[in-house]
């Protein structure tokens, strides 16, 4: 395939805060397109109507733009193969699904959610992986027509071969073989008429002329489904490349519970986008020690997709901090540094809102750093002494911290009102007054017992920062409990 024909895409789902993993995959695709003189396309995959929101879509676009990733086609700029938002393409998919059914490769399934859940529970109890048991495969054409005409809710599933295996070549993993018995009869079209990710993904990649699909290794097991859909439609699949997942230092999967994973966390704390891209780009190149500081153009020059490792890319925040420091000191002139600081401050909602809250709580401007500096620190340096004024034992504080952490994860819209509501409910469940519950949280989030209002502060810090600070506080308090302090 000629380099000029290369077309790659990043296809995030707008269902939450933009993740550094999205930036990682997007950067690979961007560099791949640059290397081959191809096109980098942005597509919004919002088939999950219950979780996708315009607000999250805007955050995704803003985050990728902040990273310095420029796309040739997308929902904001259009292009020859739009629309670039799956919810705007709903009518495009159904004919492809109907073709699969008409050719005998798909079937209508009338199983209720309750019946499917009972099926899965029985399979789990028997020690089997849950997957569809094929009940509706045996329905006659007459019965299917009758139930469809009666308006009975149903989905469309794909048929899977009953024996043998799917063999394919992956750009990273090489030759892969997955037995068909491990592949589920995937839903292609949901009862509401929206396609599932798998169906929309294949159709969109075909219509948008995507030549290479580079995504996380978690999608490797889905390739047999996608190859089957291509075959059922008589289409040529793209080249697949499945990238190793980013991992924590202990080799566990990068998780928001262990490290801040939202791009907004790094923007708010003043990391440079060039440094973050530099850090992520090092996973895709081979360099000698001392050559780590690279611009986007230099990353593109050194980019080599032929030598990707299957080992997990370690997300080492200390290395990111080191790179960010070097970018600030070595890559920015004094004028550029001043301009970056001013731009960061002027565009920083956390700073603006923090100043509003501080105005009625200080008598001199010089008091501001002590009162609001916690909003911008990546590490509070929390020590046991910070909890000295809390009227609770270390064991009681630890119980509070460990209880509220999962409770806060339940919040759908992160704002001070929902935070207060959830913490009041937590206090009630623990049989404690709200004041007793928020006392250790106050220290955990701000590092001090004198600071800005807790609920406002938690909203400004954001979910990922609060999660990280509560985790650190629990570790500090646990050490106090263990030492008898």
Curated annotation (Swiss-Prot):
Motif ('HIGH' region): 12-22
Name of this chain's protein: Glutamate--tRNA ligase
Signal sequence residues: none
Organism the protein comes from: Rhizobium meliloti (strain 1021)
Function according to Swiss-Prot or TrEMBL: Catalyzes the attachment of glutamate to tRNA(Glu) in a two-step reaction: glutamate is first activated by ATP to form Glu-AMP and then transferred to the acceptor end of tRNA(Glu).
Gene3D superfamilies: 1.10.10.350, HUPs
HAMAP family membership: Glu_tRNA_synth_type1
Record note on quaternary structure: Monomer.
Localization (cell): Cytoplasm
Classification via Pfam families: Anticodon_2, tRNA-synt_1c
Entries under PANTHER family matching the protein: GLUTAMATE--TRNA LIGASE, GLUTAMATE--TRNA LIGASE, MITOCHONDRIAL-RELATED
One GO CC term on file: cytosol
Binding site for ATP: 256
Keyword Transmembrane helix: no
Predominant location category: cytoplasm
GO MF term set: ATP binding; glutamate-tRNA ligase activity; tRNA binding; zinc ion binding
GO biological process: glutamyl-tRNA aminoacylation
Enzyme class of the recorded protein, top EC level: ligase
